[in-house]
Amino acid sequence: MEKLEGYSEKPKSRQQYFVYPLLFQEYIYAFAHDYGLNGSEPVEIFGCNNKKFSSLLVKRLIIRMYQQNFWINSVNHPNQDRLLDHSNYFYSDFYSQILSEGFAIVVEIPFSLGELFCPEEKQIPKFQNLQSIHSIFPFLEDKFLHLHYLSHIEIPYPIHLEILVQLLEYRIQDVPSLHLLRFFLNYYSNWNSLITSMKSIFLLKKENKRLFRFLYNSYVSEYEFFLLFLRKQSSCLRLTSSGTFLERIHFSRKMEHLGVMYPGFFRKTIWFFMDPLMHYVRYQGKAILASKGTLLLKKKWKSYLVNFSQYFFSFWIQPQRICLNQLTNSCFDFLGYLSSVPINTLLVRNQMLENSFLIDTRMKKFDTTVPAIPLIGSLSKAQFCTGSGHPISKPVWTDLSDSDILDRFGRICRNLFHYHSGSSKKRTLYRLKYILRLSCARTLARKHKSTVRTFMQRLGSVFLEEFFTEEEQVFSLMFTKTTHFSFHGSHSERIWYLDIIRINDLVNPLILN
């Protein structure tokens, strides 16, 4: 435990002290209102078209924030429209939101500087298109075929928002900025409860996305920081366990002797003393730990996670939230795909002179499929089909032009195929394509007050070309015109596109739920 505390003290040498004065710079709030730093998503704040911030206004806002009556008034009168009440100009939620967005940008600066001045030997080598979501799947294809056990972890939210402030003290030692952060968090927790409910966290997530993302990423980075420490300690344990024996050669000879007496004993016992490499992948508030070790090793890691979360983050992870599964017998939902590693049996008949024999070959394969029912449910919520998958028209779009309707339906279809291009089986995708194509035809037929058959005959191939996906164009280049190839077959070629940096809108609600 002393080593762990010393390990957590190391980053304090890179702490930044002068963050608070940046809150009085006007360009900070121009970033908050516009596109932010590094081209991030714009902050959507209502009613800020004709408003301008100055350093004097920011100073007055901060002074008012330190008066408790402002926050108590906000809690006792939550339904009061302070945005339109010009007498309560400084009390408005609008300006507190602007200030919190500016604060979120300011506190991001020390972390950006820490990445710039990182030693060269510790820098991660830059890899093109590493930000792509699809770049994770080739890694899983390469590694998961050689692993045995898989653990699913739901990263919990902090019980108290004060924990987030304490975690930032490792990186920022600017006391006024930390006090200001406490005022923001106490505002969202309503000053009432000692234990912050999930409602307060979701309120912060909804009203101030940038500040919530920064706090959550800081929290998760500390979580992974200590997880890395445990991983390094497990590697040292492997070397220590080997060094406890006086002579490794005699130990190996002894194990070989036991292996002769008890077939299979040598390999299993050696793995008991080794701590294999642990693979870690985080996504959407969840994490995956995969290893080649034994079930005993996975239980040891489970105990590690429960204990260090209770000690450093002051919350109790329920052991049942960490699921231990054998990789070959489990199927896990990962970024809109149902992934699994099944074992395929292949019988090979060999003929040697007059003797013939069968060889039973078992091969692992990383399989990714598209879940049909959840995606049909997403299309149903978007009013493209019924709950059972029957296509219907979309009356909201009947006021648009024909080209706009075709473009919208075709773009949705292409985006679905583009995101799920790594699926092993395309049958579900072609079912979704059929739903969108027929829904588009019904919408156009409803607009022109005609039947679907008549409208399809009038458009012909122009209507079909709108739903010709990018993946089908790639496959059309792979086969000559003389070769008969059906795009509606069950081909299993997978394509991972490295330009996808966000989850498809129809897939994202499925993951969040």
Curated annotation (Swiss-Prot):
Entry keywords, A to Z: Chloroplast, mRNA processing, Plastid, RNA-binding, tRNA processing
The UniProt record lists the keyword Plastid: yes
Entry-linked InterPro entries: Domain_X, Maturase_MatK, Maturase_MatK_N
GO molecular function: RNA binding
Disulfide bonds: none
Gene Ontology annotations of biological process type: mRNA processing; RNA splicing; tRNA processing
Cellular component terms (Gene Ontology): chloroplast
Subcellular location: Plastid, Chloroplast
Repeat among keywords: no
Segment forming the signal sequence: none
The family this protein is said to belong to: Belongs to the intron maturase 2 family. MatK subfamily.
Family annotation (PANTHER family): MATURASE K
Role, per record: Usually encoded in the trnK tRNA gene intron. Probably assists in splicing its own and other chloroplast group II introns.
Stated name of the protein: Maturase K
Gene that this polypeptide is encoded by: matK
